[in-house]
A protein has these predicted regions:
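Topogenic membrane-insertion module of multi-pass membrane proteins
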Residues: 1-70
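Interhelical loop and helix-boundary elements at the membrane-water interface
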Residues: 2-3, 15-40, 75-95, 134-155
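Hydrophobic alpha-helical transmembrane segments of polytopic
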Residues: 35-38, 58-62, 121-124, 128, ...
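Membrane-embedded alpha-helical transmembrane segments of multi-pass integral membrane proteins
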Residues: 42-45, 72, 100, 128-131, ...
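Helix-coil boundary and interhelical linker segments in multi-pass alpha-helical membrane proteins
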Residues: 45-60, 96, 100-120, 163-181
């Protein structure tokens, strides 16, 4: 009976069985999480720039966050450092970069003068991004990964950022064509 205890290995949460050696602890891996942190910073930077009226820089920061978001998962897969922590951290960073940042950039740029309707519209975008990310997290193991269901939050953020960037850089006034209502 003592021999059975010695040969039996228990797998605890966060432990990964290797291909023939002892268990190794799967923890927080640095490299992919550095990309995620950089993406989170880009989203935060976009919010700060929007609050300072620098909408072109804010839009570029959202695009940079999208680029970094595409790299963090690939780096984790290439280095075989995927973890549940990394997936959750990525999702939280996505909420800032592709949920809160585009909503606040759009609000500061075009919706602020609409009073209550402006912040409600910005909040609806932010809540939609949160719901999309939560649904993605719950369905992660169920859905065919070759296809997207719905519009991914980085793509929605890119549409908003691209719209703001083009209109701001081309100095299109907000009162032309009812641009506030389009935003």
């Amino acid at each position: 009976m003592a021999d059975q205890r010695e040969t039996k290995q228990e797998y605890l949460p966060g432990m990964v069985p290797p291909r023939g050696g002892a268990l190794r602890r799967r923890g927080i891996y640095l490299l992919p999480n550095l990309f995620t942190t950089a993406g989170l910073f880009a989203g935060f930077y976009a919010i700060v720039q929007a609050m300072n009226g620098r909408f072109g820089e804010a839009a570029v920061a959202i695009f940079v966050a999208g680029l970094l978001d595409g790299l963090d998962g690939r780096v984790a897969r290439m280095t075989r450092t995927q973890s549940e922590f990394g997936a959750e951290y990525d999702s939280l960073a996505d909420m800032v970069s592709f949920g809160a940042a585009p909503a606040l950039v759009l609000y500061e740029w075009a919706l602020k003068d609409l009073d209550r309707f402006g912040w409600i519209a910005a909040f609806v975008y932010c809540a939609g991004a949160a719901l999309r990310l939560a649904r993605f997290n719950v369905m992660m193991d169920v859905v065919d990964k070759r296809y997207f269901q719905g519009l991914p939050s980085p793509a929605a953020a890119a549409l908003v950022a691209g719209f703001v960037w083009l209109a701001h850089d081309n100095k299109i006034p907000l009162d032309d064509w009812g641009l506030q209502w389009v935003a």
